[in-house]
Amino acid sequence: MQRALRINIGQLEANMQADDDGVERRVDSGFIDITARDATGRLVVIELKTGMAGQRAVAQILSYMGDVAAEEDTAEIRGMLVAFDFDHKAKAAAKMVPSLELVKYGFRFEFSKA
């Protein structure tokens, strides 16, 4: 899923570009799936979850965002938590963090004969 999102990151948000040379960024609290920059150049921490994401996923990405903010010496960090869906606790927690966006993914198969 991470590879597919990297290839199609512009579908997540217009003019977004990965900023991590295709490698997960290591911070004190773990490994960030994708570090990107938005159209304004602001850093965006992207965490991917297959299936349902809960409040632990929100805590995880907030930890990553805090680590990046400290490393980069800026509070101008955005977060995008990408999952198939989010439980009530994740949605409630994310409402309190304006710089964090919950994004649902879907996919469809395309087939062609070889």
Predicted regions and their residues:
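Charged, terminal alpha-helix-loop-beta segments
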Residues: M1-A114
